[in-house]
Amino acid sequence: VDVTTAAAALDRLEQVYSSRPGTVRALAEQGRRVIGVVGADVPVELVEAAGAVAYRLHGHPDVLSAEAQEVLGASLDPVAHSVLTQVLGGSLTFLDGLVVSRDSQASLQLFYALRELRRLEPHRAIPPLHLLDLLHLPTEPTARYDEVRLGRLADVLGSWTGQPVTAGLTASVAAVAELRHLLREVSDLRRGPRPVLTGTRVLRVLGAAAALPTDVSLPLLRRLVDGAGALPALPQGRRVYLTGSAQDHDEVYVALEAALGCLVVGEDTDWGDLALSADVGGADLGALARAYRDRGPAAATASLPRRAAWTAEQVRRSAAEVLLGVVREHDEAPAWDFPAQRAAVAADGVPSALLARQPYRVLATDLRSALGSATCEPVLSGARA
């Protein structure tokens, strides 16, 4: 798609976000190999080096089947139910393979369920599966362990696509490094004294980039970043930093910004800024292993002190005025983090609020109640979320 302005590039990326399954299906129909990805631990660099599009799967509160809930059990993060609903419903049959990272209990249970269903019910047309189990301890044995796991993943990807990763790894590492750099620049457009993007739009751009090959996403992102100075400044709303469960759809952001008038200036979750925290130092499996081992601390895999320190630093960096935790039911890890996060930001005089055990669809009224006296002035008057 030829776009000539930052606004046009932004519109195109938002269109992709709202139609991700259809967009990726169209790429598959054009002959592109597509690998589904669950979780943030799967290196996009390896998928692209194998000649495929990395499509990070996501859910939505409107896409939940009774069958998926029965298969996985009710006491599991509903994101896994939604992803399984899509697989069982046949809407992801264009995938050439599916890599599930063991970054949460829900992801692990999803993998086991899919593997068993693929074995017992071949008519389901469930794609080939692979489980990626990376560790995040800051030790050399961890790096060596992770390097072996990435080597196995590279072999699996090559067998699925027919293209070994070795020849394309240097180019893919460079492309994904530029992608992360540009996405960090985009994320910064909601911060600073003159924000020009809402957190909602940043979330959508990041989500779109997780569904596009870099040869498609990079030109759009370059245009957006290069022309951002021409975008209109937003009125200043109360600056909210979001923690808790990763938001794989935009309804919480829309409620905070369009309904309550806040501005989401950052988040420590892996559908947002945390997904951009891996810095790969070379075009080899060892460098990838170290980068993904050391990426920003996720709730399910990092220590409480490291999470709290990361959150506090990002709250300071974004000049946030309140820390808001939104934690889904059956996603326990982020709730354990919150007391330490609350104490860390309180040392800087930043108030905090927590919404725990939330349904997959969080209501604006509940967000308003959680914020309490931390009311927001309208940030989106005359502008889209």
Features from the language model and the residues they span:
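A charged, amphipathic alpha-helical module
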Residues: 2-33, 147, 151-277
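Redox- and metal-dependent alpha/beta enzyme cores, enriched for Fe-S-associated oxidoreductases
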Residues: 39-59, 241-316
